Amino acid sequence: LFHARGHGVSPGADSRKPETKSVAQALRPYRELVFIESPGTVDGGDVLVLGKNIYVGLSTGSNQSAIDQMNAKLGKYGYHTQGVEMHDCLHLKTAVTKVDDKTLLINRKWVDVENFEGYELIDVDASEPFGANCLPVGDAIIFPVAFPKTSAKLAAHGYKIKSVVVDELAKAEGAVTCCSLIIEN
């Protein structure tokens, strides 16, 4: 499921498919909804929206059929969707997330930087490979306490950090964006 702002899911895992009904119900008052049809699947953790560009990690939960449908259905809103190959990670947002409109936090070992030309890149600390998942909200970056070296890099770039404990989410390679759905005005 996707709406005109490029958020939502049609998950690849059968166990997650029932979630789409409640998410659609919650989003319907705020956005026009469009749906990804089978055989297309897309997990929210694979979707990175950067302005009018939507990057989808090609994973076990997201496929080319969904990317093609997203281009067809979201193109009328000015969005372009492209697939991104990943290496050794579950989802795209395990490897790269948006810090602000011009800056990304990235683990270069898990995703090719050529996909993100034109953005300033802040590298995770080499000892914190899972530290690339952050969530900008307002004037702050919500960021896991488990990655203090990467947090210090963000702070050195002038970002205000709001630290959170996500140890239980991390056990399933989850992070701050996994439990968040930000609806912009």
Language-model regions, residue ranges each:
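The feature marks the mature, well-folded catalytic cores of soluble enzymes
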Residues: 1-185
